């Protein structure tokens, strides 16, 4: 804990321990102490991830009276005109990775990308939440690979990932490429100057 002496804890509003562990590792690179806050916050339906994250961060900051950040991400598949995009969580819960593979079964073009939006809000300030984005290009592979990670990780292979799906990578490896890690690093660099 001495690494983080005199640093303000920032609270990550999520119920997803996998997301939290990824975020904690990235923010630790910047010596930013992070705590998980499992809090129900508003998640609007919108085609824009930044709007979703911004609304959730504002609501969570008001409810908790703490400086918080939220992260929302989506998988955008080019052959499906960007579907599932901001609805990725719902689609994953209803169709899963096998459903996505079935939909893409006869598609030759399997290009896709993950997009992440991180939003920070401090209830002591009247300003709009600050947002940060990360994006990783890749493709949907033809069958699930690996046992690490969560969500769409077994079917997404990032560009430059040496032919590995996210689910075949350790958290440290995944954080070299991931959309979430990119957005979190942008947030961390900004947050260092903020505190």
Per-region residue spans from a language model:
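Anionic-ligand binding patches
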Residues: 2-11, 18-195
